[in-house]
Amino acid sequence: SGKLRYDLYPDYKANRDKNYDKSEYDKMINDYCKKVIEYSKNKSSKEINQEKEEENFHRQRDILFKCLEELYCRQLIFDYVEGDDLIAYYCKHKKPNEKIVIVSGDRDLTQLIADDICVYVTQLKKYITPQNHIEHIGYTHENVLIKKMICGDVSDNIKGIKGVGEKTFFELFPDAKTKRITLDEVLEQSQKLIDERRLKKLKPLKSTENIINKVTNGCQGEDIYEINKKIIDLSEPLLTDEAKKGIDDIMYAPLDPEGRDFKNLYSIIQ
């Protein structure tokens, strides 16, 4: 659940599939055994199929969690927070000299890459590091945040500046592909581009004016840069105190081999 982000931005992930109540998934993990669903005669086949899909989801997820536990993979689930923030907090407080590989299809996580942290992007089937981010993603990892602050994120329904997508962003600020830029520099360069066109008796580009005037189709209004930064910036994870304690507890907890073997794993997946 991403309640902490919904509180900042009500339209967060509003474009996602509404058929499932994702918050209910987390609540039902521990009492998964309550499988029985009562079907009333007046339910449509669509409703029945949806309930079957939900039941299958819970069953498969429960099996996956048991397999991971058997393989010594520690798991954390907390209300109101998202996996990205748990990962970011762990990376921020990792053990000295610990090397981390994050496996995800979410390229937002490349914000976290460092000399000892890389992201295996599942769609690309590549390990993304500070050295190859430009080659595989197209621009320096240092600008993942600023690009999304300006352009938004379609997958999470985060609106950006009107008329400024990724292509336009890099056309306006080509240096952003290879070196870190700040919001102040984006605003300064936008104003410079506006002034240059006016000197040539040309109408300023709407995209640069929108950047200066903070024009967006989203509900963020004039606070768009501040709100988008809080939603997207993984250097400051949005976590509850309970979630922080949960991560702290597992970081140095010893592995418990008692009762684990491949026979158990085989019986789980049968």
Give names to the regions the model predicted.
Residues S1-A14:
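Extended, highly charged clamp/arch subdomains and adjacent linkers
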Residues N15-I269:
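Extended two-metal-dependent nuclease catalytic cores across DNA- and RNA-processing enzymes
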